[in-house]
């Protein structure tokens, strides 16, 4: 998982898609996995969403990746990842108002650098 997550920016698109498909199949019941796996897989998922939507402009496995992240609890471990996933879904759907609201929430919470980074991706 670590190697896959770190190699996303330089991976061939077909390899990226194939590996993400394997992650989704292997961890389809992520909510039943140990917390360490949940954290790592959810990080890989968010990185995939960023890479797929913002860099590669591909849609393969995006819905499935979002659905997998949403199986996790909205708590201090995964809440931010769920919010970022919502941002990417809003971006995908062209909902600029909701995107701006999420960025405003992040700024209000002191996560200005993250909000600004998302700003550059919209």
Regions found by a protein language model. Name each.
Residues 1-30:
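Hydrophobic, aromatic-enriched interface-forming segments
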Residues 19-122:
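C-terminal regulatory/effector modules of DNA-binding transcriptional regulators
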């Amino acid at each position: 998982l670590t190697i896959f997550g770190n190699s996303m920016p330089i991976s061939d698109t077909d390899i990226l898609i194939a590996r993400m498909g394997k992650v989704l199949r292997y961890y389809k019941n992520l909510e039943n996995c140990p917390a360490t796996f949940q954290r790592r897989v959810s990080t890989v998922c968010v990185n995939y969403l960023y890479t797929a939507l913002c860099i590669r402009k591909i849609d393969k496995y995006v819905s499935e990746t979002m659905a997998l992240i949403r199986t996790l609890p909205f708590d201090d471990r995964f809440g931010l990842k769920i919010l970022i996933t919502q941002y990417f879904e809003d971006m995908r759907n062209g909902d600029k108002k909701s995107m701006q609201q999420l960025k405003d929430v992040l700024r209000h919470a002191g996560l200005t650098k993250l909000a600004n980074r998302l700003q550059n991706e919209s």
